[in-house]
Amino acid sequence: MPEYKLQAPYTPKGDQPAAIKGLVGGVNDGEKFQTLLGATGTGKTFTIANLIAQTGRPALVLAHNKTLAAQLCNELREFFPDNAVEYFISYYDYYQPEAYVPVSDTYIAKTSSINEEIDMLRHSATRSLFERDDVIVVASISCIYGLGIPSEYLKASVKFQVGQSIDLRSCLRSLVSNQYTRNDIEISRGRFRVRGDVLEIGPAYDDRLVRLELFGDEVESISYVDPTTGEILNKLDSINIYPAKHFVTPKDRLDSAIKAIKKELKDRLEFLNQEGKLLEAQRLEQRTIYDLEMLKEVGYCNGVENYARHLSGREPGSAPECLIDYFPKDWLLLIDESHVTCPQLRAMYNGDQARKKVLIDHGFRLPSAADNRPLKDIEFWNKAKQTVFISATPGDWELSQSTKNIVEQVIRPTGVLDPLVEVRPTHGQVDDLLFEIRKRASKNQRILVTTLTKRMAEDLTDYLSENKIRVRYLHSEIHSIERIEIIQDLRLGEYDVLVGVNLLREGLDLPEVSLVVILDADKEGFLRAQRSLIQTIGRAARHVEGLALLYADKMTDSMAKAISETERRREIQNIYNIEHGITPKPAGKKASNSILSFLEISRRLNQDGSTDDFVDIADKLIEHSAKDSDSGVSLESLPELIEKLESKMKIKAKDLDFEKAAILRDRIKKLRHRLVGR
């Protein structure tokens, strides 16, 4: 059993001890499904951390979006600094899937942009699953998409040991076949170089270099090396170099795949010609033959994922291998905000197949392209072992699966009660809202306002801004990483009010928010359903002066149930506080930069843009990191940032733009000074 070392400055309190005991008992008894029904702010993540530590199993924590996944990853890394807490989300900065619109005869080619840092974290996750037992992977729904074959990925890895005799030429060929490229001038992730008796590799799973020093054919030493300074960071006895891509296809399987694709093409062309679809047949033949030539010559083609079934040797309709298949047999699945995440699991497959069917019917893809897909709902649950659903408002399906194995967590360790709920008439609501905002802002408290439409949110934001209110507007078109920055600025007090539609409900840890305002609360629908109202009200549940204002002209069933549940919890919490002599106190949790914020900074530094932009970023990080590691990018992240800045500095110097290069040099010195002071 792996040993998890849970580190926290506090012990379980309130309902946490009973919840932990109940969940651990259920896991040890082999219960397939359990539900942690935990009110907002009751410390569900800490409860889950204790569950993982006490059961000692590798765990997959599933979140429904990148923002929540980043928050969970950060929290779990704080609880388990000595264990492997990994982060696995979609590595696309931008993704436009291949599609065809028959009405306008418009073909849309696939376009995408891969975030190298997130790709590195994905590789780090699978590496940890192969090499360690104490692994927690925090993932988004993207983990149910195909991810190569774990056994082939592991088999293709190259192992080096000190004292081992190797054939250097053979090793280099193995690296190339594993999709590493040789570059003796500049080395980075996915590259290697040879200098005399020294082989340096940029592994896919790390931003450090691996240096192998040889004496003849013998490996004399193995070490991790700083890619910028060349400084040896630590020595190793052995190391596995995993492929640069998760999709590994041996030569014999590639040959078999090409034969299978040719056979499928022949059968499909016969079918299309019999149906009189001559244009579709010609289109399919032309595209597929070109792809086959590319596969034969270079082992790759654009859209190669559409041939994934053949390349992996799967049967038609069979489930693809995904992240779950990299886990050992005995693992634990934890689904956060399950009332949102579980419906997502069910929807992913249907949405993917609808798009693929159009492409197949019109001759853009072979029928086997439909097997390049996410898992079906039933396939996912067949792969899953023991599951714990986590939500303040679990869905009916989760509750029905858990039956008697439902653990409730209502008491907050801080003693803070659920917010008071007031229903006020809509007449004069804007002026009333303005008064409440000013009252809260004067106390340095934050306010969330939810509307039904984007237009209403925009108009309200403009009105509040005209009345000298520091306000921002959050909408669905904002990139997930930028969304984190907006929420971060709210916590740091850059502004007081955040207006949104459906972006403020689940999983956001905002202890500074004391007032939540719900406009048009009596308009029944998805955004004003019982669960949505409870979740939105819960955004003020971390503040001692928490208040939820519902503007409505009538009391709907959803409103009545949401208010009743909030009052029930509030009464339980109040009685507990009185019996134990507890005085509610604020959570006092500092705002901290998420892992995604740093990845976004790295992405912007990698893009072509004005030097002033990334100099400003460096200045901001210097300012934040000088305060303390919680208010800015962590010190552990600074080496990679320095490397990015140094790369830009060299480019400017090469372009003879010495003035801007000197500015960057000065910023780098300040960041290095911060590192030395650790």
Curated annotation (Swiss-Prot):
Gene field: uvrB
Description of how the protein assembles with itself and partners: Forms a heterotetramer with UvrA during the search for lesions. Interacts with UvrC in an incision complex.
Keyword Zinc-finger: no
PROSITE patterns found in the cross-reference section: HELICASE_ATP_BIND_1 (PS51192), HELICASE_CTER (PS51194), UVR (PS50151)
SUPFAM superfamilies assigned to the protein according to its UniProt record, in alphabetical order: C-terminal UvrC-binding domain of UvrB (SSF46600), P-loop containing nucleoside triphosphate hydrolases (SSF52540)
Residue stretches making up the Helicase C-terminal domain: 429-591
Cellular component, GO, one term: excinuclease repair complex
Name this polypeptide is given: UvrABC system protein B
